Amino acid sequence: MNILITGGSGFIGSHFIEEIIKREDVTKIYNVDAGTYAANKNLPFQTDKKYQKLTMDIAAPYFPDCKKYFESLNLDYVIHFAAESHVDNSIKGPKKFIETNIIGTFNLLEIFRETNIKKFIHVSTDEVFGTLNHKEGPFDIDSPYRPNSPYAASKASSDLLVRSYVKTYQFPGIITNCSNNFGPRQFPEKLIPVCINKLIKKEPIPLYGNGANVRDWIYVKDHVNALINVLLDGKVGKQYLIGGDKEVSNYDLIFLIKDIYSKLTGINIDWEWYKHVEDRKGHDFKYAINTCDFKMEFPQFELSQFEEKLEETIKSYI
């Protein structure tokens, strides 16, 4: 298999490469990555003979002109991770999100719609579905798109572009929507590494609003394993919801992180270790994903134990 991965130096993309490159049936991995601020610089697979880094920006004006080059690679699969993903940044400056997440996805679709790739997997988010209240059940495959942040809107737009190419051009697209990922190598702007780094520095963890907002968490390697299942056996044209079946309020999460950190380090946390801050604009209250359909189609897929993987993650930062 020859596989092209966009955003393979990022958090989820790098974990995907780390796993997929171990397979004997993988011949070549091409990583198209712009090397943005969130890219990991030292990756465990970067000296592997199967691996090749292509420093490119999928949203750049030159990128569509690379079509013949990509055709020459004889690719079997494309997995599209590359995205601007930090909600707070999208509120401060949405333009980059429109460029990378929408224009970048469009450029990829145009490059590959007349090639012989077997599958184009577009990795997206559960935030496209908007928010749930405390009484509502999880999102499912029939949930309408109701994005509430510029980030979520840009990902919803890219999802719909992929869907339109599947219907219009018989493009071999698949869409996956995942819940919040966590694990080693995550850029420190995200909630869990923010908490860990604040504890290390003995600074208060900023908690939006009253901390009641709920997120569903999935360990990054579990997400990767789900995506490998989709790559190998997923059906073209389908949309898959991938979650961790672990809904936790932000308030409960920071206390859990604090307790694990204290246990691992032996440090008695006796300072003011968290503080309430002004809530995020348009802060979605709750995300949750119904994973029943995915588990029925892929019964071999298993989820890790949340607290165990959270402890492993904290260890990787300290």
Predicted regions and their residues:
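A conserved pocket-lining segment of Rossmann-fold NAD(P)-dependent short-chain dehydrogenase/reductase
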Residues: 90, 142-144, 173-184, 195-218, ...
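A short, amphipathic alpha-helix embedded in the catalytic core of nucleotide-handling enzymes
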Residues: 20, 165, 194-198, 226-230
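Short beta-loop-alpha junction of Rossmann-like oxidoreductase domains
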Residues: 131-133, 184-186, 190, 293
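The catalytic Tyr-centered alpha-helix of NAD(P)H-dependent dehydrogenases
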Residues: 147-154, 184, 188-192, 216-220
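Hydrophobic alpha-helix immediately C-terminal to the catalytic Tyr-X-X-X-Lys motif of short-chain
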Residues: 157, 161, 165, 195, ...
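N-terminal Rossmann-like NAD(P)+-binding domain of SDR-like oxidoreductases, especially those catalyzing
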Residues: 1-181, 313-316
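C-terminal substrate-binding subdomain of Rossmann-fold SDR/epimerase-dehydratase oxidoreductases
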Residues: 35, 56, 107, 199-318
